[in-house]
């Protein structure tokens, strides 16, 4: 019964970290982000959290009891995390986060509120077999 708890904690951390990084990109720009904040060491933490969130999220799927839009958001969040893993693991393997420059700055303007909303949504997911938490 731990997979839903682990998913909830790691997914919230992933989305809050994504929110913080994208907001930082908006405020200081991609050049300073890569030079001062978003290093391969940060990517190690980010990639590990994503891997744990993806594994525990897929393991929790059969116990998901949330319905309607929240169920759709669960799928969206889980697929987003899962598909993002190769990008972030690659940064660790090649020891570079310079790929950030590939994305236009407005991308972060979209990602920032989306990641904050996803972090909140993850806290609302409910799973069979857990208490009223």
List each language-model region with its residue ranges.
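Interfacial non-cytosolic loop connecting adjacent transmembrane helices
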Residues: 28-44, 85-110
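Loop-to-transmembrane helix junctions at the membrane interface
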Residues: 56-83
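Alpha-helical membrane-associated segments of multi-pass integral membrane proteins
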Residues: 4-11, 95-129
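Alpha-helical transmembrane segments in multipass membrane proteins, preferentially the mid-helix core
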Residues: 50-63, 118-125
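Hydrophobic transmembrane helix segments
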Residues: 13-54
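Membrane-interface helix-boundary signature
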Residues: 3-7, 11, 35, 39-42, ...
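Aromatic-anchored segments of alpha-helical transmembrane domains
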Residues: 14-24, 79-90
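Hydrophobic alpha-helical transmembrane segments of polytopic
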Residues: 7-14, 42-49, 73-80, 111
